[in-house]
């Protein structure tokens, strides 16, 4: 059955990683409903490692853009500034992860914590969508280093409060900083490459002996499914944000967070984490 769990985890990860609805919360519920027999350490590591598939989906989706940028980055200042902004934007997450990553993973991944992050994030998303300030940044190369750093700092909210969603925190941070929805969403994808890619690689190196218990082929199966589903989700989200706001996601987050709290209160979901 490990292959079945790997596929389901891959589907859930692929759908939810880049949508602003928290992959963590959905993986917790999915694992509970399936009754996955893996240890907490194995599940935690598996969930992080299959993010690698989602990251590869970003690289595949934007490969033409990246190839074009690679050809001109040596002399094109806007392209240089864009990627310097990505580097600057990821610094807060790197510092926070190095200093407090183990503590956060050990103590803050309880379902009730994730549920409240979903709810609060949904309310905040609604509030930000109701702001009257028009966006002033409509292209990735207009973001600048200051905005990039602050968006990266906003991204850290997902590290400090699991369930808030890295995508949601970075997209909302971008919108507060004046980016329009499509640009904020694209920059969130760019920030996700080093943030999630680094975390997935580090966890794989540190914990591959745990993953061997369920089979490395199952790990790669989960990552492959995550890749395919995430690729489709990226395309859908970009089309969606070009015509719609995030209020539907805000409502969904609140409802899903309340559902998790109900499952915890009824005893259907243990509140000690996965």
From Swiss-Prot:
Keywords: Antibiotic resistance, Cell membrane, Cell shape, Cell wall biogenesis/degradation, Hydrolase, Membrane, Peptidoglycan synthesis, Transmembrane, Transmembrane helix. It comes from the Bacteria. The keyword Transferase does not apply. Its main location: membrane. Coiled coil: none annotated. GO terms for cellular component: plasma membrane. It is a multi-pass membrane protein. The keyword Zinc does not apply. InterPro entries: UppP. Its EC number is 3.6.1.27. One of its GO terms (molecular function) is undecaprenyl-diphosphatase activity. It catalyses: di-trans,octa-cis-undecaprenyl diphosphate + H2O = di-trans,octa-cis-undecaprenyl phosphate + phosphate + H(+). Catalyzes the dephosphorylation of undecaprenyl diphosphate (UPP). Confers resistance to bacitracin. Bacitracin is thought to be involved in the inhibition of peptidoglycan synthesis by sequestering undecaprenyl diphosphate, thereby reducing the pool of lipid carrier available. Belongs to the UppP family. This is Undecaprenyl-diphosphatase. It comes from Deinococcus geothermalis (strain DSM 11300 / CIP 105573 / AG-3a).
């Amino acid at each position: 059955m490990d292959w079945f769990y790997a596929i389901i985890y891959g589907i859930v990860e692929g759908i939810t990683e880049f949508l602003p609805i928290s992959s963590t919360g959905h993986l917790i519920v999915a694992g509970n409903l399936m009754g996955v027999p893996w240890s907490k350490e194995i599940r935690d590591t598996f969930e992080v490692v299959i993010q690698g598939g989602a990251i590869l989906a970003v690289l595949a989706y934007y490969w033409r853009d990246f190839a074009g940028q690679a050809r001109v980055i040596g002399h094109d200042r806007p392209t240089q500034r864009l990627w310097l902004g990505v580097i600057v934007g990821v610094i807060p997450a790197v510092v926070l992860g190095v200093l407090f990553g183990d503590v956060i993973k050990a103590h803050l991944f309880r379902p009730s914590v994730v549920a409240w992050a979903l709810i609060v994030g949904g309310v905040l998303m609604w509030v930000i969508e109701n702001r009257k300030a028009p966006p002033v940044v409509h292209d990735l190369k207009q973001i600048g280093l200051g905005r990039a750093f602050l968006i990266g700092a906003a991204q850290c909210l997902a590290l400090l409060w699991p369930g808030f969603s890295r995508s949601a925190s970075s997209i909302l941070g971008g919108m507060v900083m004046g980016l329009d929805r499509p640009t904020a969403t694209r920059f969130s994808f760019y920030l996700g490459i080093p943030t999630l890619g680094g975390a997935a690689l580090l966890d794989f190196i540190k914990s591959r002996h745990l993953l061997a218990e369920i089979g490395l082929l199952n790990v790669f199966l989960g990552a492959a499914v995550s890749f395919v589903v995430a690729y489709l989700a990226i395309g859908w989200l970009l089309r969606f944000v070009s015509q719609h706001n995030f209020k539907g996601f805000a409502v969904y987050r609140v409802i899903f967070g309340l559902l998790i709290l109900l499952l915890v209160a009824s005893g259907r979901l243990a509140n000690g984490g996965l």
